[in-house]
């Protein structure tokens, strides 16, 4: 007889581990455990049977894979967390003794960790990193829009803003933007980078009211990881396109209006060395640290060495396989129509229009930008330095206002109009980009009622404001003719209908005997006969649905009911919107 196995030593109890057990095994605090899991990409798991995984207990706990926790035991960052705990004790002891010299020495030698090896582990290829930077970009743009506070330092905000501007400058220069959508949350952008669609959200630059219930420790951990990831991605993109990284910063433009025009993207052929930032030392926070650059360069060189080693392998006697070159995708060029939409235009942007959004889109599609805000900044600087006022002629010559073809304004009426300019509202830029062609400007003239601004990634089954509602109104009228719903038909209704037909037949016989015609109003309607046939078919379909539901499990039934509920809700909402639209159109006709 074989030995009896102990309980909870195999299966789910062996494959899963609770969070408390994981923290005890790693010998770290809960905060450090969370940071480590975020860095390594480890997240809680849901076992099929929580009772078996928790060794018979039904207490609510969080589970992780035991192999994931075992994998964390050999992480170098874990050792740095332990060293930091020792460092904090030494620093507290020195400050308690009042030994400031010793405290300063300890603080200078604080343990520091790097995430470059984690980036290479989680993203073995550059394409893997590109497919996963959507959330990273959205997070960095969010922190770039936040005000500096006790939770978020000014250094983090400025660093996030610098990375975001470097990204926008690269995407605009290479003309990679494909779609844009302005929503209540912010502006969604979509770019095609090496065949990968990258989408990110840029919040509006409004004063932010930060809620008190936000856990900034978790968000700052994600920010730390995403910052390192984007440093590597940006270095790779700039390097592959032959550009100097970090880009040169024009301190004059940066101190003024700023934006992507303040970043000068220069080719490495024209620059022998990596340039330094122009301007004072306060702007040096915009630069990427030399350590990050050296790590990115080493990582890039390491990849090249690996490729060379793979090429040196002798292929004698090896089978040859035709591998699909998934990463070698055609990159769009300037000759494509996608990046040349505004190439023949010089667009003047009014001061009431958000400059950062419109300027980025126009430059990304080949246009030239002249902003009224930059002109105001120049006038203010001249007034402060020289004490004189720039005349209109000098201003026109400096900004070449005679070449302006379009002016974007967000005002209902304009006092003066310059001859030769086409005046449009900002939505014309967004809709033209999404359509891939220049739309007629008559619908977007100042003061005109704008068409619906729809998401270019919208679902096909949802309500479409641009669709014609005439077909929908005809369907509604047909539905009104059918008075009886399928579920209201029963045997009593069939008996009443048979009696009505018998009475009608009796009337026809009496009319023939008298030599007159029967009353057509008393005849049964064809629509009702059609309804009878429709209801029989629907009845059969309903019975088939019920039979199929009998074969479902309880879990499948609940899921099916949820799906039906959401579909009914969408259809009701769509019908309500169509009804409102018809009422509005009737009012406009009156």
UniProtKB/Swiss-Prot annotation:
Calcium listed as a keyword: no
One of the entry's Gene Ontology molecular-function terms is: RNA binding
PROSITE patterns xrefs? BRCT (PS50172)
Q: Which residues cross the membrane?
A: none
Coiled-coil ranges (or none): 489-589
Which GO cellular component term is one of those annotated?
PeBoW complex
What assembly does the database describe for this protein? Component of the NOP7 complex, composed of ERB1, NOP7 and YTM1. The complex is held together by ERB1, which interacts with NOP7 via its N-terminal domain and with YTM1 via a high-affinity interaction between the seven-bladed beta-propeller domains of the 2 proteins. The NOP7 complex associates with the 66S pre-ribosome.
Q: Which family does it belong to?
A: Belongs to the pescadillo family.
Q: What is this protein called?
A: Pescadillo homolog
Please report the organism this UniProt entry assigns to the protein: Yarrowia lipolytica (strain CLIB 122 / E 150) (Yeast)
Gene that this sequence comes from = NOP7
């Amino acid at each position: 007889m074989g030995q009896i196995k102990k309980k909870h030593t195999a299966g789910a109890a062996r494959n899963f581990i609770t969070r408390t057990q994981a923290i005890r095994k790693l010998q770290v605090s809960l905060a450090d455990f969370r940071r480590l899991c975020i860095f390594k990409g480890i997240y809680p798991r849901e076992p099929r049977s929580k009772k078996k995984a928790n060794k018979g207990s039904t207490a609510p706990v969080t589970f992780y894979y035991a192999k994931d926790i075992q994998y964390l035991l050999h992480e170098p960052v874990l050792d740095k967390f332990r060293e930091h705990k020792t460092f904090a004790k030494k620093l507290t002891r020195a400050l308690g003794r009042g030994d400031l010299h010793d405290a300063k020495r300890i603080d200078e030698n604080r343990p520091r960790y790097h995430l470059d090896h984690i980036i290479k582990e989680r993203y073995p290829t550059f394409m893997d990193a590109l497919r996963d930077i959507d959330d990273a970009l959205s997070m960095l743009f969010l922190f770039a829009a936040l005000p500096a506070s006790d939770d978020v330092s000014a250094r983090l905000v400025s660093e996030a803003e610098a990375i975001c501007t470097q990204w926008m400058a690269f995407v605009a220069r290479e003309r990679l933007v494909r779609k844009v959508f302005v929503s209540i949350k912010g502006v969604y952008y979509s770019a095609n980078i090496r065949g990968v669609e990258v989408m990110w959200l840029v919040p509006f630059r409004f004063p932010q009211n930060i809620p008190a219930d936000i856990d900034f420790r978790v968000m700052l951990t994600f920010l730390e990881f995403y910052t390192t990831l984007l440093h590597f991605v940006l270095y790779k993109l700039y390097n592959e396109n032959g550009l100097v990284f970090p880009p040169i910063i024009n301190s004059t433009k940066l101190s003024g209006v700023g934006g992507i025009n303040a970043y000068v993207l220069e080719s490495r052929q024209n620059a022998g060395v990596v340039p330094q930032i122009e301007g004072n030392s306060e702007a040096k926070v915009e630069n990427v640290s030399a350590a990050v650059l050296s790590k990115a360069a080493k990582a890039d060189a390491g990849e090249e060495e690996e490729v060379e080693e793979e090429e040196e392998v002798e292929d004698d006697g090896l089978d040859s396989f035709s591998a699909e070159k998934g990463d070698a995708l055609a990159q769009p060029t300037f000759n494509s129509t996608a990046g040349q939409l505004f190439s023949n235009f010089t667009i003047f942007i009014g001061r009431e229009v958000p400059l950062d959004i419109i300027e980025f889109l126009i430059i990304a599609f080949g246009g030239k930008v002249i902003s009224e805000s930059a002109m105001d900044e120049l006038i203010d600087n001249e007034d402060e330095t020289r004490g004189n006022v720039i005349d209109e002629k000098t201003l026109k010559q400096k900004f070449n206002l005679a070449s302006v073809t379009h002016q974007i304004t967000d005002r209902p009426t304009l006092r003066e109009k310059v001859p030769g300019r086409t005046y449009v509202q900002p939505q014309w830029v967004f809709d033209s980009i999404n359509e891939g062609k220049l739309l007629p400007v008559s619908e977007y003239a100042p003061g005109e009622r704008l068409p619906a601004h729809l998401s270019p990634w919208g679902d096909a089954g949802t309500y479409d404001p641009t669709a014609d509602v005439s077909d929908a109104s005809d369907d509604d009228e047909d539905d009104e003719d059918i008075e009886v719903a399928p579920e209201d038909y029963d045997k009593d209704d069939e008996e009443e209908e048979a009696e009505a037909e018998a009475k009608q037949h009796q009337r026809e016989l009496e009319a023939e005997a008298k030599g007159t015609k029967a009353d057509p109003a008393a005849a049964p309607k064809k629509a009702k006969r059609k309804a009878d046939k429709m209801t029989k078919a629907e009845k059969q379909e309903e019975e088939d649905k019920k039979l199929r539901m009998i074969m479902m499990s309880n879990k499948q039934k609940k899921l099916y009911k949820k799906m039906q509920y959401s579909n009914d809700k969408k259809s009701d909402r769509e019908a309500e919107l169509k009804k409102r639209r018809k009422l509005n159109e009737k009012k406009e006709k009156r």
